[in-house]
């Protein structure tokens, strides 16, 4: 339901088929009007989040090829990125996830440079994604996957598609929310400082 915002999926099951300790309800409605943004917000309900707003959006292309939807926020837990290509779950990531990491990292570093935050020079994609909770869904004509299970997207064009779609919206989101952007940047820089400190301790 969350891959198709606005769609209402109604589930029902004969109660006699459910086991005694099964949490599966006999009836349920799955409806996320805001798509990935609503689903991500619901899944993180009650969790500490660095920014008040989830960064989310859509890019729709005529014919569907190159269309995508995304939602990401940063929180106090371990980062995760749930990605899909043509509604197929890509559990092992791939080129679309690479584009997502690239554009978020470059956007934050560009904002840091714009605001004179020199501490962000050490930030890399690991620091940006280590506490990011994200969802990404892309639609690509004739996608290429690694292996038969389609767990990893290999279409090189997906990197450019994702980067081009998200670059400007992310830049605008950061610029329109300077207090939130500063909090996020400080949070990511702190993750980078931790990474550098751990590396130095090992050396």
Where are the language model's segments positioned?
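GHKL-family ATPase ATP-binding module
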Residues: 1-203
């Amino acid at each position: 339901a969350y891959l198709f915002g606005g769609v209402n999926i109604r589930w029902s099951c004969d109660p006699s088929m459910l086991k005694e300790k099964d949490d599966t309800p006999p009836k349920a409605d799955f409806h996320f009007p805001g798509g990935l943004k609503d689903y991500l917000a619901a899944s993180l309900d009650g969790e500490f989040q660095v920014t008040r707003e989830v960064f989310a959006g859509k890019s729709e292309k005529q014919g569907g090829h190159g269309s995508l939807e995304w939602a990401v926020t940063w929180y106090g837990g371990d980062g995760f990125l749930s990605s899909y290509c043509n509604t197929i779950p890509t559990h092992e990531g791939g080129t679309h996830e690479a584009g997502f990491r690239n554009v978020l990292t470059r956007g934050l570093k560009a904002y840091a440079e714009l605001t004179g935050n020199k501490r962000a020079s050490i930030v890399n994609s690991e620091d940006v994604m280590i506490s990011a909770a994200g969802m990404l869904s892309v639609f690509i004509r004739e996608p290429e996957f690694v292996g038969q299970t389609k767990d990893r997207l290999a279409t090189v064009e997906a990197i450019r598609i994702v980067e081009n779609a998200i670059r400007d919206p992310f830049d605008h989101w950061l610029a329109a929310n300077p207090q939130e952007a500063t909090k996020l940047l400080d949070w990511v820089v702190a993750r980078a400082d931790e990474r550098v400190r751990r590396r130095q301790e090992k050396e």
